[in-house]
Amino acid sequence: MSVALASEYQLVQNAQLPQRWSQSARKSLAILEATARKEATAQMEAAGGSFCGQFPVDPAFKVLSLEYSAPNPDIARAIRRVDSVPNPPLPSHVVAIQSTAVDADLSLAMGVSLTPGRHTSYLVDARALQQSNSAAVAARKADGDKWGPACDEMFRGCRCVTGQEVVFYTAVKEPAGEVEGGEGSLFKPSFDGPAFRPSWGELSGKATGVVACVLQVPIGKETDIICAEYDNLVSKGQFATVDRFGGDHTVNMTGNALIQNDGKAISKGYAVAHRARVTSNVYGKANDVSLQRLAETVWSVVEKRLSFMPAYRDLVITEQGKPFMLGATATNIISLTENQGVMLHLDTDDGVWTIILWFHRHSGIIAGGEFVLPSLGISFQPLDFTIVVFAANTIVHGTRPLQTTGKIIRWGSSHFLRFKDVNALAQLGAAYGVDELDAKQRDQLEEVDAANSKDGVGAARRVASCMAAERKAAIEAQKAACVRGVVMNPCTGRMPSLLFWQVWRKPPALAVRANAVAGKKRAAADVDFCGA
């Protein structure tokens, strides 16, 4: 078992996207990007800023508060910047990719399709990223369970990218394997020396992977479906509530989590996600369809822009795990918060890619509430419909506390893979039958509740304890039979930190020919990530 599992995991670790790069595709995309950048620059100059949503966002300013207006009952739109300060620069380990040719190469190779002329691509020094990640973990420990001076200091140094579409890449010498170390130490060192100006020559033989991507989704049919399904699930009591970080953070949870009627979840704190489904007054096929439709619509919005997501799903989710996903996604849990901040943290028990989205209801002003990725040196205020897709098990992240004026509500929702639950559910499904599992778990909850009503808490606990022992035995038996829902590292019991590496063996031939013709200045602009 261990040899087979290790081999399977190694294949996942070394996974690469199908090659989409070609000279003609690269040239066409580079020309499109160059033209779109000129048009976007002209529009930005005319508007006094980058026009995203309902108002121009000036990149010279860090947005601290925004006003939202709700002309219709669906989504409130951000209409103006209320408060701001000068925007700090990016940290030295994060550099913008100025060359449209290099941007095209990375987009094609990594499966990233952002709006031409409306996005910025960055390359992040892996060694400094690891160090910054560790510093963010230390700041969190210094402040405890509430935002304090250490975390605020990190936020003040972050550059605001509100209203922008951005993608971050990093590079490592060896795509397989993980660094031993403390929290956040998941990257291998890559570039040496104080000057970080990576070029194609320096990337040759190294592996590049996507770390994070921020998307600005236009309001339309898909966002209408998403918001309608959230409304349906909230209004019918589909979500249950759990407190985190000492009760300072309240989260509404739903999805496919392992039943724990003894109160101890396989994924600590997420028993409520399953309880919400099996105790809901509208539990059943219709409600499950609503939950599936929500997850699949969000997934479709993302995979149109990040084509590596379906490949990620197909690699890590086994046949035994598929029945416990929310539709054709790699999501089994959905959380929802209302006007909430959350401390900086890592989600080490989650799958590789987490999707977080925001939308707003009613009118008013929000001060604070920025989403912060300190190791990437960025923060942003969510606008009309902002989505971030990132390696939440690798990159420290959090949301600053916020204050509101008026009736404005900022809904923030996370779609993620809690892989311990998927494994446990797959093993229980193999033991009892996938189709019978929901009914069995619902019956167990009812039996515990009946024991409590008839004979008191002590009797209920004894019944629950027997059920927990039965489940544990079934899980262990199926684990021994090699049943698993997700491919994980057999040594650490966790998922890989990053997936889909593109190893650059040589500079693209087209770039080499263009450089030879254009001269040194043109060569520097076309080959060097940082420009001339």
Curated annotation (Swiss-Prot):
L-ascorbate binds at residues 335-337, 397-399. GO terms for cellular component: nucleus. It catalyses: a 5-methyl-2'-deoxycytidine in DNA + L-ascorbate + O2 = a (8S,9S)-5-glyceryl-2'-deoxycytidine in DNA + glyoxylate + CO2; a 5-methyl-2'-deoxycytidine in DNA + L-ascorbate + O2 = a (8S,9R)-5-glyceryl-2'-deoxycytidine in DNA + glyoxylate + CO2. Dioxygenase that catalyzes DNA modification by mediating the conversion of the modified genomic base 5-methylcytosine (5mC) into 5-glyceryl-methylcytosine (5gmC). Catalyzes the conjugation of a glyceryl moiety from L-ascorbate (vitamin C) to the methyl group of 5mC through a carbon-carbon bond. 5gmC DNA modification may be required during photosynthesis as an epigenetic mark that couteracts DNA methylation. Keywords: Dioxygenase, Iron, Metal-binding, Nucleus, Oxidoreductase. Its EC number is 1.14.99.-. Fe cation binds at residues 345, 347, 397. The gene is CMD1. Binds 1 Fe(2+) ion per subunit. Disruption phenotype: Decreased 5-glyceryl-methylcytosines (5gmC) DNA modification in the genome. Reduced fitness of cells during exposure to high light levels. Defects may be caused by hypermethylation and down-regulation of LHCSR3, a protein-coding gene required for the protection of C.reinhardtii cells from photo-oxidative damage under high light conditions, causing a reduced capacity for photoprotective non-photochemical quenching. GO terms for biological process: chromosomal 5-methylcytosine DNA demethylation, oxidation pathway; regulation of photosynthesis. Its cofactor is Fe(2+). This is 5-methylcytosine-modifying enzyme 1. Disulfide bonds: none annotated. Changing residue 330 to V: Abolished dioxygenase activity. One of its GO terms (molecular function) is dioxygenase activity.
